[in-house]
Every structure is written in structure tokens, then in C-alpha cells.
């Protein structure tokens, strides 16, 4: 399936139906009086978070969504039917932004969330509504109100427990493939990964979701390489696994390059809990491994994990370290939910 993480969409709610001008006509009833019904409301525009989606690709092929108009009122005091609603179905993690791409209108993070974006126009009054003591046979009715319209942006930020960051060719996709059932493209050249990938990790009978994003290079926040737009997909992660290629020229400099991009991006990524790991250690001599480990430790100011996704060495330890941080975050969320839980006085 192709991946698309943002789309511009036009939405319009339905117009209200017009009220009806009608009079009661029956045998032996000379002055039946007005009986025009009201118009129906226009359809609303909803957005709903559904299961089974992880891309916005459907909105590449259809960008215009219009709800149905309300039906007009009819005689015998019959009101028009409400117009059919239109529902935009999106994956969990989708944000709805105004046309300025800054104002957040909705943030859908849980399956089943449903938010009304636009309300349909009200139906017009039929002439029965205008009957008064001084005007027993009004010949006027209201038209329905127009619906609302706007352009919106849908932006997907994948929901994962842990995220993989690093320079291109740091071994992120290999790590994802080794620890999950995901099958990312793996090759020995930069930017093999062109869009984010998700996988479910199982360790010690537990599960968590791991996200792999395309590699960052120096100047990514200014648009270099693939830029930093994909960093939005790890904004919701509790912990980052920063992989540094052990075969690169200088592990410390490689680490600092990515850290600078995280700081430049903002969004609190630089403050996320970070686990640092030196990858591809099976390709290093003992002397070079020691040198790269020391360089990385000085740059990160913490002891890095050592792993090889190919041989599996050090991988279980990295997964358990991620799981420990994720569990801590989940427990904190549960504790916070208990604090705010409503109780009768």
C-alpha cells in the first residue's frame, strides 16, 4: 500500500431545504389554513477514526466531499428529510488543521473518535409557521440556510510506542525487520527508506509498536535530504532508539548531527527519553569498536548499547530497555487517569 501522510481536502455541509407554501384543501372545508412544512436540515460533515488504516492515500484520489442538501418541506405539514451526512474516515493519529496549516481543529488518537467538522444549514420555515391572529393565510416561506464550506489539511502522525532515529544507513530498517514482522526495503545506500514504517515488537510476552522513519542528514530542518517532515511520526513516541552506524567515520559526530536536527525541529523531541545504541558491531574490529564506543559515549554523555541486527547480538537488551521506558510511561498515564477520575461527592 502506498503511504501518504498529509492531504488537502475540501469539505462542504449540505444546504437546508426550503419551507413550503401550501394550504389545506379538503371537501367541505372552505378555509383550510396554511399547512406548509419546514425544510429539512442539510447534512453534516464528520471525521471518524477507524481501525485498519495507516495512510491517507484515499484522499489523493478524492479531495472534495459534500454532504447532501435537506429536502424541501411539503404540504400537509410534512417536514423535509435531513440531508445525508458525509464521513471522512482516517487512521488513528490524524490531525485536522485549518487552511493556514497551523490551527488544529481536531486530533484523533483513538479508534471510534468521531467529530463534527461542519454543521448542515437549517431548513426554512413553511408558511404554517407564519400564521398569526392577524394573518390567517400567510403566503410566505423561508429558504433554507446555506451550508458551510472550507479547505482543511489532514496530517497523519503515526501512533507508536517507540521510534527509531538516526542518519541514513544507520541500520534502522534492518533493526525493524529483525524485531518485527515488517518487511521494509533494505539496501546498502542512503535513503532506502522513503516513508515511515510500523512494526509490532514482541519481547518477553509483551508487545509494543515501533516506528522507523527515513534517515536525517545535516540541514534536514532546512529541507536537505528528505527534510524533517517525517519527524512528526515520532512526536507521539514515549522513547527514541537512536541508532549510530558503527562503520561510519566518527560515531560521536554522527550522533551530534541527528541531535541537532531534533533540537531544530522542536516539538519536544529533544526532551524525549533516548536510548543510544551503536549498530553494526559485527562489522568492526575490537580496536575500532572500542574507539567508536568511546566517541559515542563522550558525545551522548551516556553509555551506549552495542548491537547487531544481522546477528541479533544486543538486540534483546535494546528491546527490553525500550519496554522498560514504555511501561513506565503507561503506568504514569494510568496513575494520572485515576487522579482525574470523577467520583460522586
Swiss-Prot record:
Residues 1-159 form the Obg domain. Mg(2+) binds at residues 173, 193. Residues 160-327 form the OBG-type G domain. One of its GO terms (cellular component) is cytoplasm. The keyword Nucleotide-binding applies. Keywords: Cytoplasm, GTP-binding, Hydrolase, Magnesium, Metal-binding, Nucleotide-binding. Its EC number is 3.6.5.-. GTP binds at residues 166-173, 191-195, 212-215, 279-282, 308-310. The keyword Methyltransferase does not apply. It is an enzyme of class 3 (hydrolase). It is found in: Cytoplasm. GO terms for biological process: ribosome biogenesis. InterPro entries: G_OBG, GTP-bd, GTP-bd_Obg/CgtA, GTP1-OBG_CS, GTP1_OBG_dom, GTP1_OBG_dom_sf, OBG_GTPase, P-loop_NTPase. Pfam families: GTP1_OBG, MMR_HSR1. Its cofactor is Mg(2+). GO terms for molecular function: GTP binding; GTPase activity; magnesium ion binding. An essential GTPase which binds GTP, GDP and possibly (p)ppGpp with moderate affinity, with high nucleotide exchange rates and a fairly low GTP hydrolysis rate. Plays a role in control of the cell cycle, stress response, ribosome biogenesis and in those bacteria that undergo differentiation, in morphogenesis control. Belongs to the TRAFAC class OBG-HflX-like GTPase superfamily. OBG GTPase family. Monomer. This is GTPase Obg.
